[in-house]
Design a protein with these regions (language model features):
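Interfacial loop-to-helix junctions that mark the boundaries of transmembrane helices
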Residues: 2-3, 31-41, 56-60, 93-106, ...
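Hydrophobic alpha-helical transmembrane segments
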Residues: 10, 45-46, 65-68, 143-148, ...
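Membrane-embedded alpha-helical segments and adjacent helix-loop junctions characteristic
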Residues: 51, 65, 69-184, 337-338, ...
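Transmembrane alpha-helix interface/packing and boundary motifs in multi-pass membrane proteins
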Residues: 54-61, 152-161, 195-207, 297-301, ...
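Hydrophobic alpha-helical transmembrane segments in multi-pass integral membrane proteins
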Residues: 204, 294-298, 347-363, 470-478
Length: 548
């Protein structure tokens, strides 16, 4: 560990310890206050949350290792398997199984299935050959080739990791960038087109980028638990609004790049190294069929064929493993760190939900007095700002559990803007729109490393696209609300919300093993002041997960 990282570690640790010993009673959390007294488990969750947030922002350790630390700390200090000195009389500890279950959360399986598809596509050059075929219609005019590169990058990013997509497309682009004259600023437009396409394209599908999956998991789980009166959002529904949103942003980004970096080159020929005829080997054909099958199943939705989106993601896992398409070596090279990072966020959500801390925190802020517009705009801007300086996944992991609880508490006020669904989707999009600096996203860093981009141009492009993207997402959510895309709000939405905000969970909240399986990163609000966190058996949890 370097000296700088050690200093960051010490600062974050000290602040987390301070959070554990703050005089919360003097801050309003006392018996006489409607907010009530924080129990020891709630205070420990605050300490872990502060530590995780600072570690994710300052990064004294890899961000995925912070998630692992979160899970371990929760198990040994808050669970029914914690060390004896941490047991609290009169307070039911969180089930250790519910914390561990975050590693096998259905959203984790959805992402893992996406990793299998991406690895197989790369291994059998499906990505390169698709790029060759799809770029052909854009001709040799540099302006249209630029648009083509952006759109193709966006399409790949919908099903592959943003980083892998950017790395692949920059490799394709590398020989072309060398063809530009020294004084032709157009080369910067091409270099920036790749991270823009990767960052924006990932918003088109639930598996395109982790913030989407985190928001979708939080939303659908809240609906399954009955905390939210809305319809679950399927893979196909997400694409129905996500893909048009991506296309509009891509066109805007294309025009913006040409304005900032005029292209002088008159003709351009792309020779994609490694691409050729499509592989017709048996394993390659298995990849093609499985890829098309999964996409079709996701797009058509559970209502047509009956298979849950998360279950569909397991099809390529089984098929590719049994046929040898994916080997042990391929498995070892997958981005397990991303899955562990997301699992840590889900574990925080379990802690917030199970201890009743979310309800306490909500009562400290008069969200009910906020206008729905102020709530949505404020959350979006905060999320966008944070996403420019820290991991997009970390940003969503920190904010989604809290904002889900806030949205549930104020769901009657949000109906005109699309409800809690609109709030969480716009927050997920805001997390992906933070791309104004080289450190904002891995695709930005890769593009900056080519030497063809400058920080100023990246900042201008990133800020403009971030703000335009936010405004467009709000407008889209309002439009979808007016056409009842997410379903007609039920009366219970207005009835359940006040009860949920009325009182925090009691200190003796009962938490069961499977609560987290159904809760993930979401934060459930109790129904009344005498309510306890409902005891859910494993069968009920499986049913809740299937309800997604």
């Amino acid at each position: 560990m370097t000296k700088a990282k050690f200093i960051k570690f010490v600062i974050a640790t000290i602040l987390a310890i301070v959070a554990l010993y703050l005089p919360y009673e003097s801050l309003g959390f006392d018996a006489a206050s409607p907010m009530g007294i924080l129990n020891p488990l709630e205070i420990r969750v605050i300490g872990v949350f502060v530590m995780a947030a600072l570690f994710w922002i300052l990064q004294p350790f890899p961000i995925w290792s912070t998630s692992m630390l979160v899970i371990v700390l929760m198990i040994i200090t808050m669970s029914d398997s914690s060390l004896s000195p941490f047991r609290v009389d009169g307070v039911t500890m969180i089930s250790h199984k519910s914390i561990m279950a975050t590693f096998a959360n259905p959203i984790i399986m959805l992402f893992l299935g996406g990793f299998f598809l991406a690895a197989a596509a790369t291994k059998y050059k499906l990505d390169l050959n698709l790029a060759r075929v799809l770029l052909k219609p854009f001709g040799k005019n540099p302006k249209f080739v630029l648009l083509g590169l952006m759109l193709i990058t966006a399409v790949f990013s919908m099903f592959m990791s943003n980083t892998a997509t950017a790395a692949m497309m920059l490799a394709i682009l590398a020989p072309v960038l060398k063809l530009f004259d020294e004084n032709d600023r157009g080369k910067a437009a091409f270099a920036l087109a790749i991270p823009l396409g990767a960052n924006i394209g990932g918003m088109g599908t639930p598996i395109g980028t982790p913030p989407n999956a985190i928001a979708l998991g939080a939303l659908n789980d809240a609906i399954a638990r009955g905390d939210l009166a809305a319809n679950p959002v399927s893979f196909g529904q997400w694409m129905a609004f996500g893909v048009p949103y991506v296309i509009i942003l891509m066109v805007v980004a294309w025009i913006l790049l040409m304005k900032i970096y005029p292209i002088k080159m008159k003709e351009m020929v792309l020779n994609i190294e490694g691409a050729g005829k499509f592989d017709t080997s048996p394993k390659a054909i298995i990849v093609y069929i499985t890829f098309v099958l999964c996409v079709l199943l996701w797009v058509t939705g559970k209502g047509v064929h009956g298979i849950n989106d998360n279950a569909i993601a397991m099809i390529p896992m089984a098929v590719f493993a049994l046929t040898g398409v994916i080997t042990k070596k391929d498995l070892n090279e997958m981005s397990w760190d991303v899955l562990w990072l997301v699992a840590g966020g889900f574990a925080l959500g379990v802690g917030l939900n199970a201890t009743g801390l979310a309800a306490h925190l909500i009562k400290t802020i008069p969200f009910a007095s906020w206008s729905p517009v102020a709530l949505m705009v404020g959350c979006g801007i905060i999320c966008l700002f944070m996403a420019n300086f820290m991991s997009h996944t970390s940003t969503a992991t920190l904010l989604v559990p809290i904002l889900c609880a806030v949205g549930i508490a104020c769901q009657d006020n949000l109906v005109g803007l699309g409800g809690v669904t609109a709030l969480l989707v716009s927050v997920a999009f805001a997390s992906s729109l933070g791309m104004s600096m080289p450190i904002s996203t891995p695709p930005n860093a890769l593009a900056h490393a080519t030497g063809y981009t400058d920080t100023k141009g990246m900042a201008i492009t990133g800020v403009v696209m971030g703000l335009l993207g936010l405004v467009l997402s709000w407008g889209m959510m309002i439009l979808l609300a007016n056409i009842h895309f997410f379903g007609t709000p039920e009366v219970k939405a207005a009835e359940a919300a006040p009860a949920a905000v009325e009182a925090p969970a009691p200190a003796a909240a009962v938490v069961d093993t499977a609560a987290a399986v159904a809760a993930d990163s979401t934060v459930a609000l109790p129904a009344d002041s005498a309510a306890k966190v409902e005891v859910v058996d494993s069968a009920a949890a499986a049913s809740a997960a299937e309800a997604k």
